[in-house]
Amino acid sequence: MKLKRGLAGLLTVIVFAVWPIQAVLAEETDEEAKLEAEKNASLAAPIDTNSLEEWPEGPAVYAQSAIVMDMGSGAVLYAKKPDERHYPASITKLLTTLAALENGTLTDRVTFSQESVDILNWDDASIGMRPGEEISMEDALYAVLLASANEVSYAVAESTGRNHLNGGYDTFIELMNQRSAELGCTGSNWVNPHGLHDDNHYTTARDMALIASAVYQREEFREIMNTLEYHIPATNLENEERIFQQNHKMLWE
């Protein structure tokens, strides 16, 4: 299988669209109709950059907010409500990864506490780590970015906070907010490293573009994101290796 590279390395594209998931969950006809109306309204919402003189008109998209930013210059090429707040869900893990890479090493040991696995509901993304289990930071970040493993994100925060920040989980969350502000993010608040829902955990399309541009500068991040399949070897508590694949369809051919 051939890996695709190209424009994905030049532009940061952030889109907040929630209706497809909600529509699947909706059981009542009136609720589906309401969601369909909201979806159509999002398509009709004005695009900020279309009001610029002598600027190419951008396409309508089914999204509450969207942005296309050139990573080299920071120029915004397309924007639709880029500063409106939204719940980021798993793209939170981009900031988690950035903070971990900037403050630790890939050879660090990540240890899983009871708290790290207790956050999970039955349908949350996970690779089945157990309390007391240990893996390397490198293995952990592959699990965070390729498998979107929520318990691993929590353990990365705990371990980095403990090993490098003279604190623990809460110290890492403070660092996430500090780093976000340093990047110029003005509409974000981070309360966890995984993105599981919290009313006080939010960001904007513009802020996520800034975060994505920053983490993309890290060679370790690019290497992980260009990996199609990864194997975590047996651990101190698990005899079998864990295998997961890249789910980004633009990278497969």
Which residues make up each language-model segment?
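Domain-terminus/edge residues, biased toward the C-terminal soluble/receptor-binding domains
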Residues: 1-2, 185-189, 197-253
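Active-site-adjacent loops and short helices of periplasmic peptidoglycan-processing enzymes
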Residues: 26-206, 210, 215-219
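Generic structural signal for hydrophobic residues
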Residues: 11, 175-176, 246
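Sec-dependent N-terminal signal peptides of Gram-positive bacterial secreted proteins and lipoproteins
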Residues: 3-25
